[in-house]
Amino acid sequence: DRYKQLIGQMALLPIVNRGIPIVADDYVESDFGTGVVKITPAHDFNDFEIGKRHDLPIINILNFDGTLNKEVPKQYHGLNVDEARKLVLKELEDLGQLVKTEPYKVQIPRSERSNSILQPLITNQWFVNVEKLSEEAIRVVENNETQFIPKNWENTYFNWMNEIQDWCISRQLWWGHRIPAWFGPDKRIFVELNQKAAEKAAELHYGKKVVLKQDDDVLDTWFSSALWPFSTLGWPDETADLKKYYPTNVLVTGFDIIFFWVARMMMMGIHFMDGQIPFKEVYIHALVRDEKGQKMSKSKGNVMDP
């Protein structure tokens, strides 16, 4: 209620001199601080969702190398984020619009491997709609067709599955299973088992042979891992091993990958194996930690040499 008279009006963004709309959204806690936040839909996960709800423009200001692009004033072109921040402060001060500067703690996303600060960037990716897939995977655990040991880890499984979102399965890496998608000369996409099949489909569509370019992205490692219970046994062929060993009795794993691996194996197994669960029991073991209680990781350098 404090700012309802401002909703629907515009604020002027300094330096850029662009009008930005003032909107109301439940994401903001009205009784916390000023009850007002600035959002950047192209460079923050929560802001992106708010931007979609209010049909706000998605303005990306970053190049892939982390420098600023031509969506910003000319004096900022090519600067990295740290350089740009310093120049913003100087320009605001020169304009007489800088009220104060003070140290302020905020949550900043960092790479779990390099510890570098992450700068979110809007890009085109491949997604799997897993909402329907999750429904049956939830049901079989609720009905004890698959059981967690200890049983309390079912809560972690359900928490993830009940809040599941579309799964981004594409990665921009040098190593991995290449996404089986090919682009035609007009960017039409052909998804096939191999390039020969894609070329055949493209020839039927265009009425002639054309040059196709395969997508450079690779699959999320957890995608191929999700197929492990049956793909290692000869699937999609109906092999003797597949008939004998699928489903298996027990999966032994750590609690930290219940969602990343266990849940996805459940969804993929049930979907591709005619409703059959991949395993009957999931045995969750403890994690070996270092003397400070931290998970052992190559990136942290706290792994013991065996």
Each model region followed by its residue ranges:
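Conserved oxyanion/phosphate-binding beta-strand-loop segments in alpha/beta enzyme cores
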Residues: 1-27, 56, 116-139, 206-237
